[in-house]
Structures are given as structure tokens and as C-alpha cells.
Amino acid sequence: AWGNSNTDKLISILAEADAKATFFVTGEFADKYADDIKKLSDAGHEIANHSDKHPHIKGMNVNDLIADTKECSRKIKMITGNAPTLYRAPYGEYDDKAVTTLFGMGMSVIQWSKDSIDWDKPTPETIIERTTKNISGGSILLFHNDLENTTQALPTVLKSLKEQGFELCTVSELLLEGDYTIDSNGTMMPKSKATVNPIIYSDNHDANLAFE
């Protein structure tokens, strides 16, 4: 999550589509925008850990990673009353040591399967194209919360996904209720399938919206 100027818009857009999303926030964001995190949580959206200081965790000292992760979780729990169990690595970068450390802390490391690349400020039409084509059940769509083009594109994205038959839920809802699990690379996969082969998720029409 970046700034907070679109918080109310996002809550309204998601509510109108009856959609729930997972927001990965940093501790620094929590320091600045605790009220916005509370609004998102109260609206039924999931708040997850995106680190405290947004460091590069690949090659990071284990004790430093643990401390940084715990601090972000502490801040989120202070605001929402719930300790997060999902973690997204800053920059999408990690290594086996970091993943093992985070798993040992009870955190599921989450990656995305469809990136809107909205940080590059594409047109709303481009965002729609990237996030509504070739979507399969269990997909995690990545957006950033404080970009105007994303806010403009989102109603059409949500409408298209629902018309394709997808239920829009949080990552945790899919893990708890769906036929999916997270592998050691943070990738969503069916519990009953091997990861070495290309997979078409045909048995569960859930898609996940993730913001950071």
C-alpha cells in the first residue's frame, strides 16, 4: 500500500461489486494511515504483512528479517485486532532462507499470478486488459492502492471477472475454503496437483484481489 487518497473510493468500488480483497501493508504505512487500515478491515478486507521498512529480504540477516516482520505484524494487530498470517516480500524478491524463516514464524509467503503493472501508470484500458484476460481459478491479481488509473479500471475489472464466473475473495478465504495451497515459492497451486506441470485451475472459480 502506498498513499491513502483512494481508500474510500476502493472501499466503495469493492462493496458495490460484493468483492473482498487482501491489502498488504508496510509498518511505515500503518504508522501514517492507521485510520485507513481500520476502515479497510472494518469493511471486511484482509490486512496482511508487507514488511515494516520494505527491505530487500533476499540475503537479509535472519534475526533482522524476524524483527522487521514481527514489527509490522504488531502494528497491524494494534489497529485491526488480528495478527496477519500472510506475507508478501518487498519487490517480490526472496530466497529459500527467507521463505523458511517466514514459514517458521507461521507466515504464508504469497506471490501474485497476474500483475497489473499499475505502478508504471498505464492507461485504465491497459490495466483492464492485463487483469481480465487468461485468468484461472486461484489467480492472485496485483494492484497498488493509490493510483488513479487503477481506481478507474477497477469497476470494469471486477465486472468482467464476475461475468467470467469468478468469486472474488481474500487470499486467506481461498486457502481455508478452496482446493489450493501455497508452495515454498509463494505460488498458489491446487492441493491435489504437482507443480512441475502447467496447471489449468478448472475446479474452483475463485480469484483473489491483492493490493500493496
Protein language model features and the residues they cover:
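C-terminal domain-boundary segment and adjacent tail
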Residues: E16-A17, A21, A30-K32, N149-F211
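Active-site beta->alpha N-cap acidic-glycine motif
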Residues: A1-M60, D64-M78, N82-P84, L176
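Active-site-proximal beta-strand/loop segments in catalytic clefts of secreted hydrolases
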Residues: A1, F24-E28, S51-D52, R88-G92, ...
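His/Asp/Glu-enriched short active-site or ligand-binding loop at hydrolase and phosphoryl-transfer sites
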Residues: T85, E93, A98-N134, F166-G178
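Conserved, mostly hydrophobic/aromatic
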Residues: L14, I47-H50, C72, Y87-P90, ...
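Non-membrane alpha-helical structural segments and their capping/turn regions in soluble enzymes
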Residues: V62-A67, E125, E148-T151
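Active-site environment of divalent metal-dependent phosphoester hydrolases
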Residues: N4-N6, K32, H54-P55, E93-K97, ...
